[in-house]
From Swiss-Prot:
Name of the protein this chain belongs to: DNA/RNA-binding protein KIN17
Gene name of this polypeptide: Kin
Other comment: Recognized by antibodies directed against the RecA protein.
Entry coiled-coil feature ranges: 147-180, 252-275
Source species, domain of life: Eukaryota
SMART domains assigned: Kin17_mid
Family of the protein in this entry: Belongs to the KIN17 family.
Gene Ontology CC entries for this record: cytosol; nuclear matrix; nucleoplasm; nucleus; protein-containing complex
The entry's keywords: Coiled coil, Cytoplasm, DNA damage, DNA recombination, DNA repair, DNA replication, DNA-binding, Metal-binding, Methylation, mRNA processing, Nucleus, RNA-binding, Stress response, Zinc, Zinc-finger
Length: 391
């Protein structure tokens, strides 16, 4: 019987079978060969190439098992990290997706006999969080990427700094209130009983300066105060007001108010605050990655849109192409002196300015703020990565 034609149903079926997954028991991990049926697998086991691979493996079987185990672990964790991230997922779901790849490492070639043993091993090694439920074992990937850990530490540091600033502000306000209360002498009124020797005599009140706030009831034959006493009382009250106004005006000149000091603290905090996301719409950036080819390497473009703080849609200036890039693949562009720039980080973030000069040795620049409440302020020593040219 002749060989089947290329477009015959049998040939087409054979090509479809060769591309798909076959039975696990007919796969040889040492030779990395998949057989279609039992007869083919038997013939492969009797072949010279298979016998040669078995001789090599028999010399150092532990080395081959360690190699397959490491490859299986790396591929499994890479799939778990990329596909599911840090979500809690059933281990069988991840395994089924892993074995759907035709060139995967089979578990029977590794040091783990079952998926449960492999799951427990991941938990013991601290690579994943594992827990057993009535429905089976669940795993959760632990992200130990240095970049992710750095971002988490920066976020925790920023939260701690905000809490410290709030505590300092509250403590400062309490201190100001305490100082204000200490400056005032709390007067306690003294009460005395009214004594009258003669019921027919009229009662008068002595309002002299030496009375000190206590009303002493005395008996006298006079029925009213004379005009001289009223003048004395008015002059004494006016003198007190002048003294109190002068004494309150002097510390106001020496000390700043609580509101002014709080505003200075907030301005200082904003000036020193930095973020890891610096992309802003409307700035000119340069592509520094070579993954896109030489066509876009070292080429400039304008940021049209910022997605999730760290991704930008860049329109190339020469070709007009639109590319979606991460900020790690971009860098800022420093224009010539006299051109307009945008501050991307630090206390002046979001303000536009004019580039005055460049210090090439210190990799810094001097700009003049053109917008906002700090318009006209001259800022020295601002880093290259904190400013970029405006489109």
């Amino acid at each position: 019987m002749g060989k089947s034609d290329f477009l015959s149903p049998k040939a087409i079926a054979n090509r479809i079978k060769s591309k798909g997954l076959q039975k696990l028991r007919w796969y040889c991990q040492m030779c990395q060969k998949q057989c279609r049926d039992e007869n083919g697998f038997k013939c492969h086991c009797m072949s010279e190439s298979h016998q040669r691979q078995l001789l090599l493996a028999s010399e150092n079987p532990q080395q081959f098992m360690d190699y397959f185990s490491e490859e299986f672990r790396n591929d499994f964790l890479e799939l778990l990290r990329r596909r599911f991230g840090t979500k809690r997922v059933h281990n069988n779901i991840v395994y089924n997706e892993y074995i759907s790849h035709r060139e995967h490492i089979h578990m029977n070639a590794t040091q783990w006999e079952t998926l449960t043993d492999f799951t427990k091993w991941l938990g013991r090694e601290g690579l994943c969080k594992v827990d057993e439920t009535p429905k089976g074992w669940y795993i959760q990937y632990i992200d130990r990427d240095p970049e992710t850990i750095r971002r988490q530490l920066e976020l925790e540091k920023k939260k701690k700094q905000d809490l410290d600033d709030e505590e300092k502000t509250a403590k400062f306000i309490e201190e100001q209130v305490r100082r204000g209360l200490e400056g005032k002498e709390q007067e306690t009124p003294v009460f005395t009983e009214l004594s009258r020797e003669n019921e027919e005599e009229k009662v008068t009140f002595n309002l002299n300066k030496g009375a000190g706030g206590s009303a002493g009831a005395t008996t006298s034959k006079s029925s009213s105060l004379g005009p001289s006493a009223l003048k004395l009382l008015g002059s004494a009250a006016s003198g007190k007001r002048k003294e109190s106004s002068q004494s309150s005006a002097q510390p106001a000149k020496k000390k700043k108010s609580a509101l002014d000091e709080i505003m200075e603290l907030e301005e200082e905090k904003k000036r020193t605050a930095r973020t890891d996301a610096w992309l802003q719409p409307g700035i000119v950036v340069k592509i520094i990655t070579k993954k896109l080819g030489e066509k876009y390497h070292k080429k400039k473009g304008v940021v049209k849109e910022v997605i999730d703080r760290y991704t930008a849609v860049v329109k190339m200036t020469d070709s007009g192409d639109r590319l979606k890039l991460d900020q790690t693949h971009l860098e800022t562009v420093i224009p010539a002196p006299g051109k307009r720039v945008l501050v991307l980080n630090g206390g002046y973030r979001g303000n536009e300015g004019t580039l005055e000069s460049i210090n090439e040795k210190a990799f810094s620049a001097t700009i003049v703020i053109e917008t906002g409440p700090l318009k006209g302020r001259r800022v020295e020593g601002i880093q290259y990565e904190d400013i970029s040219k405006l489109a």
